[in-house]
Each structure stands twice: as C-alpha cells, then as structure tokens.
Amino acid sequence: VREAWKSATDIDSLCSSLGISPYLDKPTRKLSTGMKQQVKLAMAISTGCPYLILDEPLNGLDPGKRKTSCDAMRSEVERGRSVLISSHLLDDLADLTNSFYFIEAGTLVEKIESSSQTLKQEYLDTYEGGE
C-alpha cells in the first residue's frame, strides 16, 4: 500500500489506527474477511480524493473493528472529505452521519437529516412499525 500511491495521508498512522499494520506484508488472500475490509478502507482513504464512496464498508467486521472503521471515516469527514456510505448497519452509522437516504428497489423513499436518536426512531417507525 505504502508504495502504490503517493498521497498526503500518513499511511503508517492510518494502518496503525485501523489495526492492520501487522498484516501489511501478507498477501490479501491470506487475510480474514474483516482484515480485507480494513485494508480496502485504508486504500480508499489513502487516495486523498475529496470524496469517498464506500459500499458496505462495515460488513464482515466485529463490533470493535466496526467502531475503528467508523472512527477512521469520521476523521476523514472532520478533515473536510465527503463520505458516501451504502450500508444496512444503521446503528453503527447513526453517530457518524448527518443525513440518511433510504433507497428501496432503486427509488429514494425517504431522506432524514437529524440527530442519531431521531434517526433511529424514524427508521423504526418507517421500516419496523415503531418500537
């Protein structure tokens, strides 16, 4: 990863924060699904592009790694990057975002811009019939 792309991102620090430093010399085919997800996230972040588009970046991760990944994505937002995430894991992302778009069968069915608690309640009301 370090030599593949010239970027202002501190690769060593990024890999350390994601917990993947010990695995950098291993072929990805020998990594677990979760570790592969972490490597993919590190690669996306390391590009330095102003926009990150991530499809299910938390799938295959244990709760600790999901938090680590959310922290990394939050750091990128705080640095001024825009992050678009496609995910089914609402609980993990509720504290990370300020906007949620619910898409069903390719159609936008609802947009919510609010606090994480309001968002969770809106989701429950809309998709699970309330608490």
Residue map of PLM features:
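Conserved ABC ATPase "signature" region
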Residues: 3-24
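Hydrophobic anchor residue at the start of the ABC signature
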Residues: 41
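H-loop/switch region of ABC-family ATPase nucleotide-binding domains
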Residues: 86-88
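Catalytic Walker B motif of ABC-type/P-loop ATPase nucleotide-binding domains
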Residues: 52-56
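H-loop (His-switch) and adjacent beta-strand-loop-beta switch element
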Residues: 100-113
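Helix N-cap at the start of a conserved alpha-helix in ABC-type nucleotide-binding domains
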Residues: 63-64
